[in-house]
Amino acid sequence: MEYSAKADAKQKANQAKQETKPWIRRLGRYGYMAQGTVYFLIGILALLAALGLGGKMTGTSGMLETVAGKPFGEVLLWLIGIGLIGYVIWEIIKVIKDPENKGTDAKGLLTRAGYAVSAIIYGAIAFKAISIAMHAGSGGGSEKTISAKLLAQPFGQWIIGLVGIIIIGYGLYELYNGYSERFMNKFRVSEMNQHERKIARKSGKMGMIARGAVLAMIGYFFILTAITANPDQSKGIDGALAELASKPYGQWLLGIAAAGLMLYGIYGVIRGRYEHMSFGGK
């Protein structure tokens, strides 16, 4: 009887575990779509700025505050915030369970560390989106504020430098992934028609190259912060876009980067719909 009870309990636990997997997948898919929406909106604002039509070079914080001032903005902020929570949960699963089989060699650990950093960043963005939607303030999580707090800690400069290296490494990985079109291997292409495959390939390639370049610039800013111990050197997407705009032919560079981020947003929505998501043991 005791053995039977234990076996029954184990079977129910396994069944419950299997039943939760589709829900976690849905959260992850919704999360990819929410992330895509964030990049698409940032890209739109940057493109309008490049065209002189009233947009602005902004990161996630500025974009969320801009959205809050629009009709139905608070509803969209709630959707983005909840969606990004799903994205964070899926990134944590990728770090711990390694469903993509990245492994434990140097390359695999760097990639999984990138997922961990991504989970932290998007967790902060989700909190900020929900805070603004609840009229609870901006949440105060800018790169400069975070860097200043880290610099005040023991080994703070080393930590910031390590974060910068991870971000650059992940940015280069995005560049390679986009250029080689390896991301298409993650899609359930048998469920996509020819038009959807074409859009996924084009938007993913250009979008990942643009995002990879922006991430590499952000990582470089973090390393500058570590070297100079000056938190003002830390910049996010807005700083990277402003840096591009300050160069010769800056408006053209800004426009290209903005278009790339918009394409990454489109890719994110397609990714949420068609990416193969497994737990490795399925």
Residue locations for each model-derived region?
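Hydrophobic, ordered structural segments
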Residues: K17-W23, L27, L41, L45-L48, ...
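Alpha-helical transmembrane segments of multi-pass membrane proteins
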Residues: G36-K56
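Juxtamembrane inter-helical linkers in multi-pass membrane proteins
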Residues: F183-R201
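Hydrophobic alpha-helical membrane-insertion segments
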Residues: Q35-G43, A116-A129, M206-I223
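C-terminal functional regions that serve as terminal interaction/effector modules
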Residues: E2-Q15, M208-K282
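Short, membrane-exposed interhelical loops at transmembrane-helix boundaries
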Residues: T58-V67, I146-L150, E196, P231-W252
